[in-house]
Amino acid sequence: MARDLVMFRDVAIDFSQEEWECLNSYQRNLYRDVILENYSNLVSLAGCSISKPDVITLLEQGKEPWMVMRDEKRRWTLDLESRYDTKKLFQEKDIYEMNLSQWKVMERIKSCGLEGQESPHEVCFRQVTKTTSGKTPTYRKLTSLPLYQKSHNREKPYECGECGKAFRVRQQLTFHQRIHTGEKPYECKECGKAFRQCAHLSRHQRIHTSDKLYECKKCGKIFTCGSDLRVHQRIHIGEKPYECKECGKGFRVRGQLNLHQRIHTGEKPYECKECGKAFRQYAHLTRHQRLNIAEKCYECKECGQAFLCSTGLRIHHKLHTGEKPYECKECGKAFRVRQQLTLHQRIHTGEKPYDCKECGKTFSRGYHLTLHQRIHTGEKPYECKECQKFFRRYSELISHQGIHIGEKPYECKECGKAFRLFSQLTQHQSIHFGEKPYKCKECEKTFRLLSQLTQHQSIHTGEKPHDCKECGKAFRLHSSLIQHQRIHSGEKPYKCKECKKAFRQHSHLTYHQRIHNVT
């Protein structure tokens, strides 16, 4: 059976600069994915090397595709009789051609610019009309041909058999299914890292080529995509434009809001086929499945602890070997992980790129800002199932739970003292070593713990960030505020076993107990 030749331009979509600037990052990524995937398919079908179109070269380099628009003087004749399968999109000086199957993608990308309502059984040729305002181009109808109704009524006919998620374009379903299969056909020749989509590989390769990288001026973090940098910068300015209508909580990224809303709806679309347990996020399902499959875990031969990835095991193994390859040039302190060194160096530089919008307090880590903001919001997301007490930090919950079980698995080899948390053991061991790595720049006093230095520095600054909501009195330390609040609440948690007298502070109880010891 004879076959018609397929040219790359038959499965391509072209944009002018004006059109390209009207697309958001999601629409641009969709365009890149479709074009790169189509080119990949043509190469595989050809079975031999073919010349690479300029637009593919630009997309692989992360550049804008409109840079290869056809010659302005070149015009093609619209001939529906001889080219019935092809639609043509005219602009004043440029003419672009696309295949019928790709028209549906174009329809989706440009749907925000439609004027009026067409028949649901028609797909229209439209002419782009340039606008002086720079907004999304408008369109006027030239002619029409029958097409599926789904292009207009926004149906999603392509459904994933694994999780039920539906898509308007078959190509999107193909990309999505690779999440379930784990297929990552696009591999970086420089570092071996693999990706599900060709566009993701192209963006990654900019790291190696140093082509058009975007650096955050606040913290120095590097991004290969401008949109990723813009999203990241919201961490520093505290911007959270996506708000949940149910509880008012804000998010930096729309995807985070979508995941959060499942808490209110109770939706758990990802189900484990082994045990039937369902999850709100696919990442949670993946983690659950890997925990259930022993052969996929990475186990430490020294202590038997298992990890979900080999990287985690390698970092953990340094605990046993004592290896700390990343050393601070200022104080000589060494770290197992480079990221720990980067964060540590901010102690010396004084860099605190994360600002609280409520009180202006700055932090060296984004996570510390997140925890701090819970003081203002009152959020305590971690609940103890034993006593229903809530905590702002997960570490506080874990530490608290040790009270119920009485377990203290981390023992100091120097003195035999045991602790519930490994971090507590690490802090304690600095007593034996005499190590005090945290120095106050004002008075040169040194401290074992960063928290001690932070508390001390408030003496110099006069800062009292902890306010009593009852009387407005402010305190340097949160513990001082807790003690003060007992005046208003009348709480006296420290009771003398001899005479049953109760006290607000433990020091008061200790002082009182001397009476009984004397007698």
From Swiss-Prot:
It comes from the Eukaryota. Residues 6-78 form the KRAB domain. Pfam families: KRAB, zf-C2H2. The modification Asymmetric dimethylarginine is found at residue 75. The keyword Isomerase does not apply. InterPro entries: KRAB, KRAB_dom_sf, Znf_C2H2_sf, Znf_C2H2_type. A zinc finger (C2H2-type) spans 158-180, 186-208, 214-236, 242-264, 298-320, 326-348, 354-376, 382-404, 410-432, 438-460, 466-488, 494-516. GO terms for molecular function: DNA-binding transcription factor activity, RNA polymerase II-specific; RNA polymerase II transcription regulatory region sequence-specific DNA binding; zinc ion binding. Keywords: DNA-binding, Isopeptide bond, Metal-binding, Methylation, Nucleus, Repeat, Transcription, Transcription regulation, Ubl conjugation, Zinc, Zinc-finger. There is a cross-link at residues 110, 141 (Glycyl lysine isopeptide (Lys-Gly) (interchain with G-Cter in SUMO2)). The keyword Ion transport does not apply. It is found in: Nucleus. One of its GO terms (cellular component) is nucleus. Belongs to the krueppel C2H2-type zinc-finger protein family. May be involved in transcriptional regulation. This is Zinc finger protein 30 homolog. It comes from Macaca fascicularis (Crab-eating macaque). The lineage of its organism: Eukaryota, Metazoa, Chordata, Craniata, Vertebrata.
